[in-house]
Design a protein with these regions (language model features):
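C-terminal motif of bacterial Sec signal peptides marking the signal peptidase cleavage site
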Residues: 19-23
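Extracytoplasmic "Venus flytrap"
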Residues: 31-53, 59, 68-78, 172, ...
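Pocket-lining segment of extracytoplasmic ligand-binding domains
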Residues: 174-243, 249
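Short, solvent-exposed amphipathic alpha-helices that sit
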Residues: 44-60, 147-151, 175-193, 233, ...
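Hinge/cleft segment of the Venus flytrap/periplasmic-binding protein
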Residues: 278-326
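Beta-alpha junction/loop-to-helix N-cap segments that form part of ligand/metal-binding clefts
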Residues: 70-130, 221-248
Length: 326
């Protein structure tokens, strides 16, 4: 009887130890496989991806993480194909760079952790009513939303005599629509006439921009991936017509704007990477992680300001001569 009890006890102990070791192995893998789906190539998204990768390398070590970077070339259907391949390969985490990439990943898996970045409003992007800052489930990330009320204030600060503001944006991007609604509300409260000028894709940007520039004192371009991919087209038109653009983010401002209140997308991506490291190493559960933000700062494009004869206040920093154009 004693021998039987000892055998059972020994077996139980061995089983417990085996499970314990198995748990340790799963919680700290030799190499983490991370899939990155980026909507399109442009300065802001590129910087976010760079920051994300660097943060994971800094936190886990270069030999501990393997990246599979895929670019969807501004095709939402390609986003779905890319993230489904990540799911089939059973990657440890998916980083979705921009709203269509996040939406595709959200629809592709409910088990693999998904972190979004360069996403403006998660509630709008994922159709969550009463969004409280936490997506829950297997999704979290970072937002590139700058204070929209302060962006509206920037327009009136720089151009106090402006009576007509045109808002130029892509109608196919839900986050752009959200920003347009908010900024329009803030500007109308200042008794400014606001008109919307929307394009469905890059093919009609030139004609819509020309119309906007012909009927506006100032143009506002929100954080918008399609606009960010074609700032040269916008810039050539507005400079020729001498109509200033206030941009929702830095890459658009570098290409065609005079000023912006914008976040740094490298910092945004880096914060996303820090979140990824905490998830992969088991330090945090993604279902409890709130959407994170980074601080915005006032910046101006000296090159375009000089061309238009615009002087900005001293609290704006010069973003330099780097230009991200089509």
């Amino acid at each position: 009887m004693k021998k039987a009890v000892l055998k059972v006890a020994s077996f139980a102990l061995c089983l417990a130890l085996a499970l314990s070791f198995a748990g340790c192995k799963d919680s700290k893998k030799d190499v983490y496989n991370v899939g990155i789906c980026q909507l399109v190539t442009h300065g802001a998204l590129d910087k976010a991806t760079d920051g994300f990768k660097q943060a994971l390398i800094d936190k886990l070590g270069k030999d501990k993480v393997k990246f599979d970077y895929q670019n969807a070339a501004n095709d939402s259907n390609a986003c779905a194909t890319i993230v489904n391949s990540f799911v089939q390969k059973k990657y440890d985490l998916i980083m979705a760079n921009a709203t269509p990439a996040l939406q595709a990943a959200y629809n592709a898996t409910s088990t693999i952790p998904i972190l979004g970045t360069s996403v403006t409003e998660y509630g709008v992007a994922l159709g969550i009513d009463g969004f409280d800052g936490t997506v829950g489930g297997n999704v979290s990330g970072t937002s590139d939303l700058a204070p929209l009320d302060k962006q509206a204030d920037m327009i009136t600060e720089l151009f106090p005599n402006a009576k007509k503001v045109g808002i130029l944006y892509c109608s196919a991007e839900p986050n752009s629509k959200y920003q347009v609604e908010q900024v329009e509300k803030f500007l109308k409260a200042k008794n400014i006439e606001v008109s919307r000028y929307s394009f469905s894709d890059s093919n009609d940007i030139a004609s819509v921009t020309t119309t906007a520039a012909s009927n506006s004192d100032v143009i506002y371009v929100p954080t918008d991936n399609t606009a960010a991919s074609c700032t040269e087209t916008i810039g050539n038109i507005v400079v020729e017509k001498k109509v200033p653009v206030v941009a929702g983010e830095a890459s658009i401002c570098r290409g065609c704007g005079v000023a912006t209140l914008s976040i740094d997308y490298y910092d945004l991506g880096y914060k996303t990477g820090e979140m990824a490291a905490e998830i992969l190493t088991g330090k945090k559960d993604i279902k409890n992680m709130k959407i994170e933000y980074v601080d915005a700062k006032k910046q101006y494009n000296k090159t375009i300001c000089d061309k238009l004869g615009i002087t900005v206040p001293s609290d704006y920093s010069d973003m330099g001569e780097e230009s991200w154009n089509c």
